[in-house]
Amino acid sequence: MQKYIRWPVTMILMLVVFASITPAVSAADEEEEPTLKATSHQKHQSKLAKHEVPEALARFSFVSDLNFEYPDAVRGIYVTGNSAGGSRFETLTKLIDNTELNSMVIDIKEDNGYVTYKPEEELPYEGVAKNYMKDPKEVLKALEDKGIYPVARIVVFKDTMLAEARPDLSFTESDGEVWSNGKGESFVSPFKKEVWEYNVEIAKRAAELGFKEIQFDYVRFPEGFEKRDDELQYDLGEYADVDLDNVKKRVKAVTDFVSYAKKELEYYNVDVSVDIFGYAATIEETPGIGQNFSKISDNVDVISSMIYPSHWTPYFGIDKPDTEPYKLVNEYAKVENKVLEALDNPPTSRPWIQDFEAPWLYSGSTFQYGVDEVEAQIKALNENGIDEFLLWNAVNSYTEGVDYTPLD
């Protein structure tokens, strides 16, 4: 794990290498007048095309040797590194081949901080690299052959491996031990720009592999942080002298990271998306975790709210949201639409929806999620003008027989 300790030096060397081995670059085509398409994502991209492009970016950009087209609307599934690199990959690609699904969100850096493939050369994260995908390029080539749109998921601030290796980047108890939540998970601090750089370098490598979108997850402080803020020890870094209260400082740090990541990835011609708690859209900003829905949305191409019915209290007046997937998603979509409509250039909305059971909610039999429950969520989104969605199942076991066809 000592590779973490010397990673800033490695970063400098790596940047020198980048300068000498960067893949071919191409001159941008003459700017054409953008044509608005049918989908919200294409409309968003057309608006971006009208913005002034810095000269350096207009002339040079990364060119991948893989070719993926953005689908009519992303309808995707979550895929672990193990699934992508194992026998389950074929099952999941067949699911997409045989339905209206068209995309995969694949773990590149997972929840505990492990990177899901071994890099070809020594990199700052080599010490936490696992061989789940022996050849990620081969995985992407298979997706290219099948026309499946690839998204790289990178878990950012929940990172037990980095927190334990570098307590100075984390939150510690009074005895100096790294803090962990009830599940034994530790976080690194959004205030630390070294953490930003570490994660964005992983994102850049994913883009170089051929992923067309980088999805950042756990872009936040630990849940309930406002209750332990005074108890934990951590370095505010450059935010120590910012004239804001602690809640606003957390919001600024999280938002600044998203803005930084977006700018750093411009060269790679990838979309940037962020996963965010659904309830963040219902309040101005979350006091503990530092998420401001509007501010994050202003800095991404795609916003993916996690709106699993099982994760809601009776917020919308629905006593048991887990058993009312249509009502829950319908009510949420109305709220989110209002928030996004207030932005000058709103991102594409692509929520995460539920394809799993929630036994922790029940003392007796668990409410089952099947075809009707999954289709109900999609119907609610479509009826509110939201064409894109992602299915979450932690073990990648998705309901068979679902009709994913969009509403006319």
Question: Where do the model's predicted regions map?
Answer:
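Active-site-adjacent "subsite" loops/lids of carbohydrate-active enzymes
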Residues: 63-84, 157-208, 375
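Substrate-binding cleft of secreted/luminal carbohydrate-active enzymes
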Residues: 33, 300-314, 325-330, 335-408
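Aromatic-lined carbohydrate-binding/catalytic grooves of carbohydrate-active enzymes
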Residues: 99-133, 226-234, 405
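Sec-dependent signal peptide cleavage junction
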Residues: 19-32
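Aromatic- and acidic-residue-enriched segments that line the glycan-binding/catalytic groove
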Residues: 117-127, 159-181, 219-241, 291, ...
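Aromatic-lined carbohydrate-recognition surfaces of secreted/lumenal glycan-active proteins
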Residues: 78, 151-159, 215-218, 248-288, ...
